[in-house]
Every structure is written in C-alpha cells, then in structure tokens.
Amino acid sequence: FDMRPEDRWWCTADPGWVTGTSYGIVAPLLAGVTSLVDREEFDAPRWYQLLAEERISVWYTAPTAIRMLMKAGAELARAHEYPALRFVASVGEPLNPEAVWWGKDVLGLPIHDNWWQTETGGIMIANTPAFDVKPGSMGRPLPGIDAFIVAHEEADGEPPRVRVIDAP
C-alpha cells in the first residue's frame, strides 16, 4: 500500500472480518497512519463524500463495493474531487477488468487487486504501486512468496495425479 505517515487510510471491511481487523485496524496502527473506521452500511453518495471530505489517500475496498459504486453511476462519483487519493486496492474476490478501468476513468486511478486468505495471515499476491496494473490480474507474488498453480490431471488408464506448475 506504500503507506506514508501523512496518509489517511480507509479499509471498508467490517472490523468483525479478518480484513477489517488486519488491514482496517492493525495495519494502519503499525504504519502510524490516520485511519477511517466507518460503522454505517454501504451508501454510494456517503462513501464518495467520505473519500473527498476526509481526504482519504489510500483506499482498500471490496470488488462488490466497487461494482455497487459503478452501478450508482459515474456522475455521482464526479460530483466530488479526490485530490488526496493516490492508491486504490481491492480484496475479497476477483476484480473484473471493467472495474479497473472504471477506477481509472472515474477516480483517476486504476484499482489494484490482491489475494490472500485468513490462513495466510497477510497479502501473498498483489498489484503493488510498483507494478502497472493488468486488468483481470491480481498481480505478482510479493517478495519471499513462491506461488504455484496446482492442477489435478487425469489421463485415460492412469491414476489421477497432481501437477505443480511453477513457470509459464
């Protein structure tokens, strides 16, 4: 997320979920940044107002929320300006390419996807600020992470086997 001391961070995940706890509360505290915790339900006009008025610089949200904002219309987003916003990321499910381009068009920034799960304890694969975003891709393994594709194969007359694909 390239958090900086002057950042204003907003993770829209509920603190009752691991993303909300890990990245909504613990991560900004460890990074020493100001964090917005919003207890209200999703409301597109209010979310845009919060992004603008709270001068959010790094925003972490879910693809479902992004698609709901898309459905609410670009004109609603364009009713505000977001001069502080410098990085937008999503997590929780695959981010469709249209959402990445919507972010670039409406917010002026592409949306960076990433992947992790409760069992990993943190982000494993990401489109970091250092990478150009390829819509439809969640990014690359972070330093120190080896990621593989595991394929279950069955051939006629042979027992099933698992194949690990570690190179393109």
Give the positions of each predicted feature.
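Alpha-helix N-cap/helix-start capping motif
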Residues: 15, 41, 63-64, 93, ...
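Conserved beta-loop-beta connector loops within the AMP-binding
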Residues: 148-168
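Membrane-embedded alpha-helices of multi-pass transport/permease systems
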Residues: 22, 63-66
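Thr-Gly-centered strand-to-loop micro-motif
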Residues: 11-13, 37-38, 89-91, 113, ...
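Short Gly/Pro-enriched turn/cap motifs at secondary-structure boundaries
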Residues: 135-142
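Conserved AMP-binding/adenylation subdomain of ANL enzymes
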Residues: 1-11, 15-58, 71-72
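Gly/Ser/Thr-rich phosphate-binding loop
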Residues: 5-6, 30-33, 56-61, 70-133, ...
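Generic structural signal for helix capping and beta-alpha/helix-loop junctions
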Residues: 19, 45, 68, 97, ...
